[in-house]
Amino acid sequence: MPKYQPKNGELNPYIPRYILETPRYQQDIINKSPEQEDAQDQTTTAHDPLAHQRKTGEIIDNSIAQSGTGIKDEFKGTIRVEENESYDSKRDRWYGYSTEEWLTHLKNWNDKKQSRKHASAQDNDDSDDTDYELELIELELDKKDMKKNIKKDPMEKMLRDRQDIPAYIYNITSNPNNKIRIEYDPKSRLAKDSAKGFLNKRNQFVKKLTGDGDELMKLQKMAQELDNEHEKDRKLAKLKQEFYGEENPKTVPQTDLSLSLEASPTLMMLKSKQLQNEKLAKSIQSKQEVMEKYNASTESDEKESKKTGHLEDKLFLNHKYIYGSYYENGKWGYKCCKQFDKNSRCTATD
């Protein structure tokens, strides 16, 4: 088969279409002549990534050293006019920046900020906003709490008391000889301190009460004891009435509400103080009886202060007191003879 030879202006039908058609980004290069390409290479390249930022089509080749192109100095004759220049002013002088250019940049930045603030103010402009804020203030809420749907307890910000010592610190130094012993239950994960509580019949750890709670428990216990005594008297009087008949119908005492802590708490507090005073008086009386029985002196005997081996506690020159035990008119001396001379002997007659 003879080889196909296309005529002038005729395309070869055997060449695919994607080869015949040139891409759009190569059409300008292909259609230009070699002279035009050489001229373009001297001024600009075909693909300039910073073409949208250039005021002119000229591209500056930064690979060539061009230091000092922005320097524009003022001269008086042949002497350059020097000013008090800072780092920024020297940098602007080297790159050729002027103050007017910086002012234009600042103006553009401020205009953009103002436009953003104005847009945000329009978005937040709501007639019900003030009423909504007042309602939140009345409810002691904040916008952040409403967004997160969480209201923090103000007690969470309180500092822990320094005397609040955790149980695990006691557990570090605890041993059978210590007064404070921690028993840790791994099942319930509770540290049980015998000094702070006890285990009840249900194997539950009950803390010991302190302060007002302890006083209330003592009052309740005392009221219960008084009520039990009164109940015994009522039962005994009732039995006597049943046994002896109705000779004394009014001898059975009625329920006494003054013995109830809930009915009369103030009266119970006064009774507890009265019982405490009586108990204290009995203990003092019994102690006095014992002292009288064994002929013991109730007054405490004066005990001499113990002497130490220091020089301050040693007596010299038959003195009964040390030098410095007496002071008068700005002078120190001996208390026994009231002499101010340190080397003098004691002249006291006692």
From Swiss-Prot:
GO terms for cellular component: spliceosomal complex. Residues 49-58 have a biased composition (Basic and acidic residues). Keywords: mRNA processing, mRNA splicing, Nucleus, Spliceosome. The gene is SLU7. InterPro entries: Slu7_dom (IPR021715), Splicing_factor_SLU7 (IPR039974). Residues 28-58 are annotated as: Disordered. One of its GO terms (molecular function) is pre-mRNA 3'-splice site binding. GO terms for biological process: mRNA splicing, via spliceosome; RNA splicing. This is Pre-mRNA-splicing factor SLU7.
